[in-house]
UniProtKB/Swiss-Prot annotation:
The chain crosses the membrane at residues 12-32. The lineage of its organism: Bacteria, Pseudomonadati, Thermodesulfobacteriota, Desulfuromonadia, Geobacterales. This is ATP synthase subunit b. It is a single-pass membrane protein. The gene is atpF. It comes from Trichlorobacter lovleyi (strain ATCC BAA-1151 / DSM 17278 / SZ). F(1)F(0) ATP synthase produces ATP from ADP in the presence of a proton or sodium gradient. F-type ATPases consist of two structural domains, F(1) containing the extramembraneous catalytic core and F(0) containing the membrane proton channel, linked together by a central stalk and a peripheral stalk. During catalysis, ATP synthesis in the catalytic domain of F(1) is coupled via a rotary mechanism of the central stalk subunits to proton translocation. Belongs to the ATPase B chain family. The keyword NADP does not apply.
Length: 200
């Protein structure tokens, strides 16, 4: 439809150009008034050549315009601009989609980092509690071992003191009873006393 309108417009413009080419010289001649026309044949010949010149000039211009294909060039340019606009719109939409996608990925990565940070803090706190518990258990064990070692040392010291006390008691008793008691009584007393000390 656009092409038909263009052709009709070309025909109308061509017709107007021919009409103007004929009417302008006629009007120019008519405006000359009623003066004496010494050689009207020469004027008509001159007018004819002018019309032919104008027609040739108009034909050359129309041919040049068609050859230049101004409408086609403009239509192609319009199509190219529309294509460029469409491609730019598609590129913008693609860029916006990628921006949205990368924004979502960045937000997801930030959430994952926050989750990992929270998990690491929780794990670090659990590790801290475990280390503290192990340290407390080790301290309790060392305290218990020290208490047992102290108890053993106390028992050992008591035993040594008892043995020493028994020895001294035997010597003292032996010195006092040595004069009053016979050798057989003496051995019996020592054996009885040693038996009691061993039972303690």
């Amino acid at each position: 439809m656009l092409i038909q309108n263009d052709r009709r417009m070309q025909r109308i413009l061509s017709g107007l150009a021919v009409a103007v080419a004929i009417l302008v010289p006629v009007l120019a001649l008519a405006s000359g008034g009623g003066e004496h026309h010494p050689d009207s044949g020469a004027q008509l010949k001159d007018f004819g050549w002018r019309v032919v010149d104008f027609a040739l000039l108009a034909g050359i211009m129309i041919w040049a315009l068609k050859k230049a294909n101004v409408k086609g060039s403009l239509a192609e340019r319009q199509l190219q601009i529309e294509k460029n606009l469409r491609e730019a719109r598609e590129a913008r939409e693609t860029a916006e989609a990628k921006l949205k996608e990368y924004t979502e990925k960045l937000e997801k990565a930030n959430q994952e980092v926050d989750t990992l940070r929270a998990a690491m803090l929780k794990e670090a706190e659990a590790e801290k509690q475990r280390i503290v518990a192990e340290a407390q258990a080790a301290a309790a064990k060392v305290t218990e071992q020290a208490a047992q070692a102290a108890d053993q040392e106390v028992l050992k010291a008591r035993t040594e003191l008892r043995v020493e006390a028994a020895r001294l008691a035997v010597e003292l008793a032996g010195g006092k009873l040595g004069a009053a008691v016979q050798k057989a009584d003496h051995d019996r007393f020592v054996q009885d006393y040693l038996g009691k000390v061993v039972q303690l």
